Every structure is written in structure tokens, then in C-alpha cells.
From Swiss-Prot:
Keywords: Acetylation, Chromatin regulator, Coiled coil, Isopeptide bond, Metal-binding, Nucleus, Phosphoprotein, Transferase, Ubl conjugation, Ubl conjugation pathway, Zinc, Zinc-finger. InterPro entries: E3_ubiquit_lig_Bre1, Znf_C3HC4_RING-type, Znf_RING, Znf_RING/FYVE/PHD, Znf_RING_CS. Residues 520-531 have a biased composition (Polar residues). Belongs to the BRE1 family. GO terms for cellular component: HULC complex; nucleus; ubiquitin ligase complex. It comes from Macaca fascicularis (Crab-eating macaque). This is E3 ubiquitin-protein ligase BRE1B. SMART domains: RING (SM00184). A zinc finger (RING-type) spans 948-987.
Amino acid sequence: MSGLGNKRAAGDGGSGPPEKKLSREEKTTTTLIEPIRLGGISSTEEIDLKVLQFKNKKLAERLEQRQACEDELRERIEKLEKRQATDDATLLIVNRYWAQLDETVEALLRCHEGQGELSSAPEAPGTQEGPTCDGTPLPEPGTSELREPLPLQLRPPLSEPALAFVVALGASSSEEVELELQGRMEFSKAAVSHVVEASDRLQRRVEELCQRVYSRGDSEPLSEVARARTRELGRENRRLQDLATQLQEKHHRISLEYSELQDKVTSAETKVLEMETTVEDLQWDIEKLRKREQKLNKHLAEALEQLNSGYYVSGSSSGFQGGQITLSMQKFEMLNAELEENQELANSRMAELEKLQAELQGAVRTNERLKVALRSLPEEVVRETGEYRMLQAQFSLLYNESLQVKTQLDEARGLLLATKNSHLRHIEHMESDELGLQKKLRTEVIQLEDTLAQVRKEYEMLRIEFEQNLAANEQAGPINREMRHLISSLQNHNHQLKGDAQRYKRKLREVQAEIGKLRAQTSGSTHSTPNLGHPEDSGLSAPAPGKEEGGPGPVSTPDNRKEMAPVPGTTTTTTSVKKEELVPSEEDVQGLTLGAQGPSSRGREPEARPKRELREREGPGLGPPPVASALSRADREKAKVEEAKRKESELLKGLRAELKKAQESQKEMKLLLDMYKSAPKEQRDKVQLMAAERKAKAEVDELRSRIRELEERDRRESKKIADGDALRRIRQAEEQIEHLQRKLGATKQEEEALLSEMDVTGQAFEDMQEQNGRLLQQLREKDDANFKLMSERIKANQIHKLLREEKDELGEQVLGLKSQVDAQLLTVQKLEEKERALQGSLGGVEKELTLRSQALELNKRKAVEAAQLAEDLKVQLEHVQTRLREIQPCLAESRAAREKESFNLKRAQEDISRLRRKLEKQRKVEVYADADEILQEEIKEYKARLTCPCCNTRKKDAVLTKCFHVFCFECVRGRYEARQRKCPKCNAAFGAHDFHRIYIS
């Protein structure tokens, strides 16, 4: 039951409107706790047990409160420790910087003392006075007071550690700390004053030195420039000193203001901290009150549980004693009901009294306000009366009419004078405008003549320049056309060469693919006949020369070839690798470019190739022949060796022929280089392009011949393989593979060289294109210059025409001005006529003024009649007001009677409701003679109230926090899941967090 009571108390605290919460809190604060009832006890042991249980319960409550207090105190201690740490840190920072300041001041004082000792010594007559070793001027000799040591109590504890400083501050009292800090401040002030005095003495010393220099300059022959320089430096020094003093004063003032603001900030922070502490104290008090309230609620819940348990026991018990208990509980319920009724009645009476009290206070306030207003009637009220407004309207009307007449008269006179003055001014302006226009016309004619002469000169100069440019363009035209034709032909030829190179590359890839297939076939055949050996297998295992040995070459070795041969799918990878190798690297391109500059390197390269091939063929040694070999095979092997030697000799001959060709090309390149150096720029470009073209053609022809040879050899090898037996085919295939590898390396090197040469040719062609572009740009610039000259000539013609037109227009303007002068004379005549007409109109205005005065008299008479009418209306208004005053008391009486009737009606309704409740209770007593039956009926009513109104089967165990209507949890959850999220009673919308369970015990 205690758990249910706690849940109910928590639910009551969490739900309900704030008004109900406040009333409940007020009730709990005034609740009287009844003594604890221990119930039926049969022995002292049970008494001790229950007392111990109660004590344990109380101790647990106190322990919880103690733990909460300890947690809060621990938090406060942590906050205070943090604050103390920050305060200690700030104190240490202040102490450190103050100590540094004192040390620097002492160092300055020691420096000045040393300078004073040096300056106190007698000076030699021939020595020059100047600054010391550290760059500061010597002070005066009379600085003995600076050398006096400061008192010990004024010196700060500079060597004192930080922790000792904090401990000393904590150990000493506030008076001691204040005295110590005061002494430290006095020391700092004294030290700073000493520094200032020393600086003043130094300044005086400098001035004396300057005076001595001036006097010595007067006695000794010095240049005027040096004297002027010293004077300027002295003035500059004084100006800088004044500026420094001003800046120091400004800095001191700003620092004082900053310190004041800092003090204000610290005071505000202390106030904030104090307010935070007060807030924490108040929160502590609130927590204490809340705990007390929870405790009282718990006691009240336990008391209610015990009361309910006693009620149910009494209802379930039988006999005479049980009947007495039920009757007492019935009386208790009746008293509670009467008490509630009386409370409701008292609340209604109190509301009525408060309403009447508010009405009474409002009436008293209005009465007092009206009395005060009646005693001091302001002028505004008098001005707001009808009579005053009528008189004011009549007066303002007459006054406005008189002002209008007066203003009209003044306007007529002013208009007459203005017309006369404007007429005279207009005549003067016309004369001055005529003179100004004549002068302007003369000056413009002179300017136009000058501009015309200048334009003619410019036109002649432009014409001469245009003819010169035209002649120059006619001479340069054929050359430019020839250059364009040459460039276009070279571009077409370069495109053709690129196409041929692509085609040869494609053929080379096909040949490489066929070589890969042959390798695969030969590797398969070697695996099929493993017992047969080849005398040159050891020579095949030697690595082929790569790029590291002698320039560009194939990267793959025979070992790699043997490893890759068994897998047929690896042929594509080898072909792709070879395709990548066909692209010349940057090192090869650089080598080719260097070969163009120094052909000896290219000459040495072909000589190195046959040596490498011979080394590959000779190898580490021939393997031992097989044991089961026949003499015919040995003869074949000898023939094969002879054939290999013959092939090597042919290869050497080819390499020597290539060497000769390379030497011849070297000589041609030297000749071309000499011609290129001696020829002009345009011819050099032409020669370079032609040489590149010739070189590319030769390389293409050589590549074609190489490809044909490779194809023929491939065909021959395929025929030999088809005709011979298996062993001969295998050996021939191996030899062919070796030979093809070597040829492939050579072709690759040649191909890479050709590709690099093609790149060089392309680069030269691009340079030529850039040069041609520059030439075309120059041609365009010349054309643009010619066009500009033509446009300037056209513009000059147009300007000439425009100037003529302007001259004609100015002549027309002169004629127009003459016509304007004539027109102005006509307007003068018209204005004179207008003046005469205005004089006539002035007479008409005077006549109109007399008519207006007559109308004014007529309006005055009308105003008198209106005043009489206002008097009549005033009498009627007074009559209406008296009648209104007579009707107002009747209205007040009727209002009071109506309020009294409504009050009596409310009272009668309350009496009727009270009597009806009593009648219902009496009927119950009459119907049910026994008190148990009455209680059972009431229990049924209460159960009906506790059942859910939606399903009428389950108990109410869920509340909607939006409207505080109670239903069963299943109905509320079903409506929420069915998206009917509205209260069944009041249609108030609710959400997922707007309903929860309640426990009604």
C-alpha cells in the first residue's frame, strides 16, 4: 500500500493544472499529521518489531536527506575550490609581473648608478664626451643619491616562490597583507621616481653636452653644415622628448581609466557572485521545503491508506460493533458532504462579496474624480462648450474674410510693382544676351577656323602616312602569300607522315603478335620434347641488353619469355608491354636530341650493338650434347652454326652500313647547322622544316624496308617449320626466336629513335607554326594599322563635314538670333500693351473691393441671425438635459431592482440544490432501511464512476494531461493507434506524451 501511495503522490505531483497544484500545496503545508496507528497487537514483540520498522523507515528518510545534502555540499565545495584556484592563479600572475617590474626598475637604477660613478670621475681634457658602451648617454656626476641602497622593508620578496607567497597570504591577516602590499607599492613608487629623476638628469646632461659642442664649435673651425645638423638634431630630440612625455601622460590617464573600469567590472562580478550564492541558498531552502512537502504527502498518503483499510474492515465486519462503525463512517461522510457544500457556498458568497467590493471601489473612485473635476473646472471644458465654439466660429469667419481682402489688396499692389520691375529687367537681360551672343558667335567662328586649319594639316599627314603604309603592304604581300602556301603544304605533309607512322605502328603490332604466337608454339614444342637439348640454349638464357647497357632496347629477357610461354593467355600481356615499350621515354628523346648535337654518340651506339649480340651468342658456354644423338644431327648442328655465323656477318655488315649512314647524316647535320647559323631567321625556319621533312621521309623508308625484311623472314621461317621434322622445326624456331628477338630489339631501338626524331620534327614544326602565327599576327597588326589609318581618314573627312555643317548652323543661328531680337522687340511692345491692360484691371479690382466690403456687411448680419438661432438651440438643449437627469434615477432604481432579483434567484437556486441533495439522501434512507445497503448502493455509484465511460467494462486507469479526463488505458491507446486522437468528452486533441497511467487504490 505504501508503494501505491507513493505512485499516487507522484502522479498527483506530475499531473493536474497549476491552480490545483497551488491549492494542494497550500493544503499540504497546513496538514496535521495524526499519530501512527500500529493496529492490532498481541504481544510486546510485535510492538518492538513495528517500532523498529517505523524507526528504520524514518532513518532511511533521514539518510536520503543526508545524502542529498552531502551531494549539494560536495558540489559547492568543488565550486569554491575552483574559485580559489582561479584566485590563486590571478594572485600569482600579479605577484610575478610585479616582481618582474621591480627587477627591471632595480636593473635600471643599477645601470644609472654605474653611469653616475663613471661620470663622477674627472674627465681628461682631450677625451670626447659621448655615450657609454651600452649606447646610453653619461649622467651627471651628482647622482650620489641614486647609489644609496633602498630600505629593506621597501624591497619586494623577488626570490620568494609562488607557493610560499600563497601560503604567506593565507597565513597572514588582512591588515598584515594590506601593510605588506602598501610597503611594496611605496617601494615601486620610489623606484619609479628614481628612474624618472635619473632620466631627467640624463636629459640635462645631454643638453649640457650639446651646449659644450656648440661652444667648442664656436671656438674651433667647424663647417656650417655640421652646426646646422647638430641644431636640427637638438630640436628633433626636444620634439621627441615632448612627444614621449605627452604619450606617457596619455598612457597614464588611459591606464587609470582602465583600472577604474576594471574595478567596476570586478565589483559587478562580485555582486553577480553574491547574487549567485543567494540564489543557491534560496534553491537550498526550496529543496528543503520540497522535501518537507514530499514527506508530508507521504504521511498523508499513508494515513489515507490506513483510513481506507479501516473503512473496508468495518464494512466487511458484522455484529453490533460493526454497525456502530458504519454509522460513524456514514456520519463522517455526511459531515464531509456538508462541509464541501458549505465550502462551495462560502466560495460563491466570497466571489459575490469581492465583486460588490470592486464595484463599490470603482463607484467611490468615479465619485471622487467627478468631485475633483467639479472643483477645478479647466479652461478646456469652457472652450468645449457650444456657446464658446459658436462665438469663436463667427469671429474667425469675419477675421479670415478681412485678412483675405487685405491680402488681395497687397497682392494687387505687389503684382503691379512686380510687372513693372520684371519688364525693365527683361529689357536689360535681352540687351545683355544680345551682346553675349554676338561675342560668343565671334569666338566660335574663330575657333572653327582654327580647328579647320588643324584638321586639314592632320588630313594631309594621315594621307601621306596611308600612302607609305599602302606601298609597304604591297611589297610585303607576295612574301606573306608564299609563306602561307609553304606553311599549308608543310602541314599537309606532316599529316601524311603521321598517318604513315600510325599505319607502320599497326603493322609492327601485328608482327609482334605473330612473334608472340610463334613463341607460344615453340615453347609448347619444347615442353613436348624435353629430352632434346639445344646447343645454344645456354646462349639464349643470357639477358638481352636493356636500356641500362646501351640505350633503348627491349626490356623482356629470354628467361621471362620461357616463363610466360606455357600460358597462352599471356601473349596479350606481352604485346601490351611491348606496345608500352614502343612509346619513347623521356630519356630516349633526350638522347636523340643530344645525338643531333653530338653525332659521335650515335656513331658509337651501332658499334656497341654487334658486340652485345656476339656476347649473347657466345654466352657462358654451350651445353653438352645428348648421349643418344646421331652423327647426322652433329652435321646439322655444324651447318646450323655456320649459318648462324653467316647471319652474324650479315648483321655486322648491316650495322656497319648503318654506321656509315649515321656518319653521313652527322655530316649533313653539321652542314645544316652551319647553314642554319648563317641564314636569316625566315630561311632558317624553312631549312629546318625541309631537313626535318627529309629526315622523316628517310626514317619512314627505313621502317618500311625493315618491316618487309621481317615479313620475308617470318615467311621463310614458317616454311622451314612446315617442311622439316619436329626437332629441326624446334631448333629452327628457337634460332628464329633468338634472331627475331635481336631484330625486334634493334627495330624497337630504331623505332624509338624514329619516334623521338618524329617528336623533334613535330616540335620543330610547332615552333615553325608559332613563328608563322607571329608573322600572321604581324600581318594582322599591319592590316589593323592600315584599317585604323583608313578609319582615321574617314573620321577626318567626317569631322571636316561636321565642321562645315556646324559653320552653316552657326550662320543660321546668327540669322535666328537676329530674328529673335526682332521678336523680343515685338514682345516689348506687347508687354507695354499688357501694362496698360493691367492698370485697367487694377481699377476693376478696386471696384471689386468695394463690392466685397458690402458683402462683408451682409455676412455680419447673417452672423447675428445665427447667434440668435444658437440661443434657441441652447434653450432646447437645457430642456433635454433636465429631462435626462429626471430619467437617470429611474434607470438606477430599475438596475438595482434587477440586480436584487438576480441575487435572490441565485440564492433560491442554491437553496433548491441543497434541499434536493438532502431529499435524495432522505429517500435513500427511506428506501434502504439498513446502513449496509446504503453503503453498498454508494459503492455501486462509486464503481460506476470509476468505470470507463467508453467501454463501461474496465476501470479508469489512464488520464489525459490536456483536459484531465480519466478513461481506461486500453481505450486511450486504441484511440491513439486508430488515429482518433481526441478526448471522447471534450474533443481535445492529445499526443503520444499526453496520457499516462494512474493508480486508484
